[in-house]
Amino acid sequence: MQLPNLQSATLLRRYKRFLADVELNNGEILTLHCANTGAMTGCGEKGDTVWFSTSDSKTRKYPHSWELTQLKNGQTVCINTHRSNQLTLEALQNKIITELAEYDEILPEVKYGVENSRIDFLLKGKNLPDCYVEVKSVTFVKNHLGLFPDAVTTRGQKHLRELIAMKKRGHRAVVFFAGLHDGFNRFTVAKSIDPDYAELLQQAVKEGVEVYSYAVKFDFSHQKPTALYLTNLVNYLE
C-alpha cells in the first residue's frame, strides 16, 4: 500500500499513550498523535527517526500522525496500527495470502458473535464455507521473533472466543497476524505477557481455528518511505 507524504523528525518522548513529541530538523517541536495504544515495546526510543503524516482536516486537535519508526538497528516498524487492516485488505485483494486466495468476496467490519463483536473481514466464495478473519498487528520483536500481544489484551481474548464459536458452527476462522515490523522471520504468542491469551489461542488451534502470520516490507524512494506491503508467510511457533 502507498503511504501518504511523510516527513521525518527525531523522537523526544511518547506520553499519555496517544501522544509523542518530536523535533524537526529546524528545531521546531511538534506533538504527534499515536494510533498505537499498546506498550509499543521496542518501537521507538528517544533519538530514533520517526516519520509522520499530516492531515488536512481542520477539526483535528493533533493533525500530525506518527506512522513509522526507523530504529537504531536499521529495522523499520509501522506505528500506525490502522495500517494493518489496510495492508491485509490489499493482500487479500491481490491474492497474496495464498491460504485465503480462493475467496472472491471480502466484507469488512461485519457484526457477528454473541459478545457484540465485529470481524475485520468476512470472506465468501462459491461452494466455500464463510471465513471469519481477525487481524492483529505485530510490532513487538525480540531476536527476529515476532510476538503478540505486547500488553494484556482482553479484547483479543474476546475475539478468540468468538472465532472458536464460529468454527464450531462449521465456518472457517482465522487469526491473521500482520507484520508491521520488518525485523522478524518467525512468530509466536507472548505467553509471559498475556498467559490467558496464549491459553485461548492454543485452545482455538485445537478447535480448528487457523493461525497465519505474514512479514512486511517497506519501500524507500528518494530517501523516504513511500509504501509497505505484506510479502510471505512466516513460521508460527506454537
Curated annotation (Swiss-Prot):
HAMAP family reported for this sequence: SfsA
PANTHER family: SUGAR FERMENTATION STIMULATION PROTEIN A
Protein name: Sugar fermentation stimulation protein homolog
Gene3D superfamilies, per the entry: 2.40.50.580, 3.40.1350.60
Family: Belongs to the SfsA family.
GO molecular function, one term: DNA binding
Gene designation per UniProt: sfsA
